[in-house]
Design a protein with these regions (language model features):
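A general structural motif
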Residues: 3-4, 26-30, 65-67, 131, ...
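Active-site-proximal segments of metal-dependent phosphoesterases and phosphodiesterases across multiple
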Residues: 140-170
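N-terminal active-site segment of His-dependent metallophosphoesterases
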Residues: 1-54
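Active-site neighborhood of phospho(di)ester-bond hydrolases with catalytic His/Asp-centered motifs
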Residues: 9-10, 31-35, 69-74, 135-136, ...
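Conserved beta-sheet core of the metallophosphoesterase superfamily
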Residues: 158-215
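Active-site neighborhood of divalent metal-dependent phosphoester bond hydrolases
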Residues: 40-126, 130-131, 158
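Beta-strand-turn-beta hairpins that frame and shape the catalytic cleft
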Residues: 1-7, 126-134, 188-189
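Active-site environment of divalent metal-dependent phosphoester hydrolases
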Residues: 13-18, 39-42, 75-81, 141-143, ...
Length: 215
């Protein structure tokens, strides 16, 4: 039985101050970032907007140390999707800001970030304390194709759909974890650990099967 401890971290949306709190209290864990680590929400009042590269750099360092895995979310994918577009054609303000920050880097550093993001997984499965965990940002499909990739990143019926529809697409064995949907939701073997609409960051610890919201 694998007794490695995992800390599943829901959508951060640029709140590096909250991430620092989580890391300080979870030092002995391996981290699974559930996507949407960047792009500050306009309704956030508890935290200030910070450079997306500060967030990505911190997570990238943990990944290179084999202490973390980043699951690609729709907000990380926005970087790849809009990379070659003229600035005036990019609708999301935060995406324009992120791409502007990337363009200020040296070519080698920029390519290093892009290679890391393009090779980050869309789904991640692991075993901890006798349980199988299957993680994705919005929809679990380990056999995704270019045609179904968008569902994995944004869910079925983007941006919102009834949770019971999501339950129809998971198997009875294993524990399924998602971010993306704004509110925490726990039922049977389906768990959504996103707390964005509470201005918090949802975190789940596999060793003690505990869900917490950090602010």
């Amino acid at each position: 039985m694998n007794t490695e401890k995992y800390c599943l971290i829901g959508d951060l949306h640029g709140r590096i101050d909250t991430l620092d709190k989580i890391l300080d209290k979870s030092e002995r864990y391996k981290y699974i970032f559930m996507g949407d680590t960047i792009h500050h929400k306009p309704f956030f009042k508890r935290s200030k907007r910070t450079s997306p590269l500060r967030m990505l750099s911190k997570i990238k360092k943990l990944v290179k140390q084999n202490r973390a895995t980043l699951i690609l979310g729709n907000n990380e994918n926005y970087i790849l999707k809009n990379l070659l577009l003229p600035e005036e054609d990019i609708l999301q303000k935060e995406v324009r800001y992120t791409l502007g920050c990337l363009r200020e880097l040296s070519l080698d550093d920029r390519l290093d970030y892009l290679h890391w993001l393009t090779t980050s997984p869309l789904t991640y499965e692991f075993e901890s304390y006798g349980r199988i965990y299957r993680c994705a940002h919005a929809y679990y499909n380990p056999n995704y194709t270019p045609e179904t990739r968008n569902n994995v990143l944004t869910g079925i019926g983007y941006p919102w759909f009834k949770v019971d529809k999501l339950e129809d697409h998971i198997k009875p064995e294993g524990e399924y974890f998602f971010g993306h949907y704004g509110y925490p939701y726990f039922r049977k073997n389906l768990k959504i650990i996103d707390a964005t609409n509470f201005e918090g960051v949802g975190v789940y610890y596999t060793d003690r099967e505990e869900f917490l919201i950090y602010y």
